[in-house]
């Protein structure tokens, strides 16, 4: 008798412990009816757009910093501690069972100055020839570098979060010890993640790349990137972060096209396949007397161009309202920190300043060497914010969740266990640093270290810039209009017109005739 048997195979067993679920901030944080406006002063910076100008006598002393329109500007805003606010109503929240946090509700990034295009370039750029419209088959010499300039890729971008944005770039990697690499071999490269700091260069059309480590000729990129690293925000990594602290939301707009097509000079590290065979799949060889007999270089590159800059495509100077963030953190500024990372090279005008250094004033005829030429670039910003005051309950589940997410949050709230009272008398020495006294058993508590102390940011203190009078500020009035808030309430008074007032009117009644 035949019988059916199920397919024998591996049986899926659930994990022994349930997978922890990450809570969204809206699940355990309660919003209040208190909203605050915060704004900055006009933030200005001036410098050289290509490189920092250093002192000749002291090379480590920077006289003029590097300020480029293609640099990342990373603002770190220090918010006031809401738990130390002197609120009018003492019963607003229970400090023994709750803590107050800030929630970002609106932001406007203001950019000052007119639109402009700033060019960059290199006086000794590795341009062997123009491959778009060649007029002959050129032969290489020892030095074919040319003075070339271009306009960078047009980029507008901002990233909002409570931790620094994460960037990516391709860098030189360590080769395998076996087989040992030879001098002149192409090194391996790897993708590297790092925080985006203030002053880091954004991609200008040549890629997110470590030019300083991987371009030994120092002539294959413009001056503003040849000695540094170009980074690009790792949106894939930040977007997949379950907490989403580094990326509440972002705005991005890129534009470029290839304007010119060049070829590099030098020895080709990767030769064409079968270059000297009788038959080749890639080309047919030339005769001995022809210039084409010696193959030219085949490292082709294009120069980028950002093209038209228009006010119709601006991401800045307009408000953004945060209703739902991309991660589980819906705009909560943990540790009273807010990071704004941005780059905008549509306001990229470089000022050329000429100063007369030599030559008589009377009957003077122009001579170029009598004038010194300088280059400066300026950046102008102004920002406004709308924050909502929220309450965090100090329950066991919430504190356990915060401890796994970021233990520093609980440390900053000074949530410590009360130690038991001493059971007996203890010894206390007077001169702890004396050689006659034994070393202390416990080191005194040191001040808490900043987790970003080694990173460079544009720090802006907003501790004294908060105001609850939203109607006195431009962004505050727009927020009140958008959300329907009037005097802190959603209720709107209904105005009754006097023309609709009720009037008493008398209606005459007729008597019915009685029938006889």
UniProtKB/Swiss-Prot annotation:
The similarity comment for this entry is: Belongs to the papillomaviridae L1 protein family.
Q: Protein name, please? A: Major capsid protein L1
**MF GO annotations:** structural molecule activity
What would be the name of the gene that encodes this protein?
L1
Bias (Basic residues): 507-516
The annotated regions of Basic and acidic residues compositional bias extend over 139-148
Establish whether keyword Disulfide bond is in the entry: yes
Question: Region annotation Disordered: residue ranges?
Answer: 129-148, 497-516
**An example Gene Ontology biological process:** endocytosis involved in viral entry into host cell
Q: Which UniProt keywords apply?
A: Capsid protein, Disulfide bond, Host nucleus, Host-virus interaction, Late protein, T=7 icosahedral capsid protein, Viral attachment to host cell, Viral penetration into host cytoplasm, Virion, Virus endocytosis by host, Virus entry into host cell
Keyword Coiled coil present in the record's keywords: the answer is no
